[in-house]
């Protein structure tokens, strides 16, 4: 069992039951999945960009991402339907908890001028989104071997009904909120 998974069962669940007064353990919000998404608009001109991004995401997530394709053509962006324009990977279970552990304890402290993550990036239904400006904050990425700095979006999906519940859940996982 992953370290954060054990931590969730032993510390987070009892803490949230006490805070929100849940009657059942199954009511306690939990993280269902973490989605990592890289939008690659520059892939239209250079096909190697997709390969490099897929390689980076594979190292970060520990599993192979799926290449996302354009759903419809947009002439203004010179995109045709079916063009590869991004890569995404969905983590669940053990891999999800291990990624969360690495993200909170190793990657976030490596961000330059880091003052904490925004406490306002919830969507109203208990899900949290965070944007990372450069992939080199992850220790798996070798700075000398990357071709370009790329950002990615990390979407954390929870079973929480409200943003307050989701924020309490993530805060109990030692998420460094600034507000």
UniProtKB/Swiss-Prot annotation:
InterPro entries on file: Ribosomal_uL5 (IPR002132), Ribosomal_uL5_bac-type (IPR020930), Ribosomal_uL5_C (IPR031309), Ribosomal_uL5_CS (IPR020929), Ribosomal_uL5_dom_sf (IPR022803), Ribosomal_uL5_N (IPR031310)
Keyword Ribonucleoprotein attributed: yes
Keywords assigned by UniProt, alphabetized: Ribonucleoprotein, Ribosomal protein, RNA-binding, rRNA-binding, tRNA-binding
Pfam families xrefs = Ribosomal_L5 (PF00281), Ribosomal_L5_C (PF00673)
What does the subunit comment say?
A: Part of the 50S ribosomal subunit; part of the 5S rRNA/L5/L18/L25 subcomplex. Contacts the 5S rRNA and the P site tRNA. Forms a bridge to the 30S subunit in the 70S ribosome.
Q: Which family does it belong to?
A: Belongs to the universal ribosomal protein uL5 family.
Instruction: Give this protein's Gene Ontology molecular function annotations.
Output: rRNA binding; structural constituent of ribosome; tRNA binding
Q: What is this protein called?
A: Large ribosomal subunit protein uL5
- What do the Gene Ontology cellular component annotations say? ribonucleoprotein complex; ribosome
Provide the GO biological process annotations. Answer: translation
Which gene does this sequence derive from?
rplE
Function recorded in the entry: This is one of the proteins that bind and probably mediate the attachment of the 5S RNA into the large ribosomal subunit, where it forms part of the central protuberance. In the 70S ribosome it contacts protein S13 of the 30S subunit (bridge B1b), connecting the 2 subunits; this bridge is implicated in subunit movement. Contacts the P site tRNA; the 5S rRNA and some of its associated proteins might help stabilize positioning of ribosome-bound tRNAs.
């Amino acid at each position: 069992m992953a370290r954060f998974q054990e931590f969730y069962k032993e510390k987070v669940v009892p803490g949230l039951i006490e805070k929100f007064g849940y009657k059942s353990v199954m009511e306690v919000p939990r993280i269902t999945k973490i989605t990592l998404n890289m939008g690659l608009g520059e892939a239209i001109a250079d096909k190697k960009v997709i390969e490099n991004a897929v390689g980076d995401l594979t190292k970060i997530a520990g599993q192979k991402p799926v290449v996302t394709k354009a759903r419809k053509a947009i002439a203004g962006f010179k995109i045709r339907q079916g063009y590869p324009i991004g890569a995404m990977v969905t983590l669940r279970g053990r891999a999800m908890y291990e990624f969360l552990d690495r993200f909170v304890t190793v990657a976030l402290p490596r961000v330059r001028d880091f003052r904490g993550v925004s406490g306002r990036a919830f969507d109203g239904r208990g899900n949290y989104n965070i944007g990372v400006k450069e992939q080199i904050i992850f220790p798996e990425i070798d700075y000398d071997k990357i071709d370009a700095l790329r950002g990615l979006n990390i979407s954390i999906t929870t079973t929480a009904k409200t943003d307050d519940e989701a924020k309490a859940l993530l805060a109990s996982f030692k998420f460094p909120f600034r507000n």
